[in-house]
Amino acid sequence: MNKERNPFKIVQAQFDHNAEVLGLDPALREFMRNAEREIIVRIPVDMDDGTTKTFTGFRVQHSSARGPAKGGIRFAEEETLDMVRGLAMMMTWKCAVVDIPLGGAKGG
């Protein structure tokens, strides 16, 4: 993946900018930049043509500080861990901004 287009790095940069504006404590800021938990699984699937293909799946729970981690799942062969990380982080902020008592997560 092109480093300049890394979705997780883009979301972290947006967070860093806003954390700077808000004057967040550096230790809290560093904690909030990364996920609480990441799960990577490899699942073998028997295909219709008789072959077996292995798929990699990701589940990222960015934060459960405000409640259970909420977030959907994306089914796409080109899904990446960094995309799922970025989307989970954004789900944390979306829930917090509208005062929904849930954390952020995503799967893919």
Language model segments and positions:
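N-terminal ligand-binding/catalytic initiation module
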Residues: 1-108
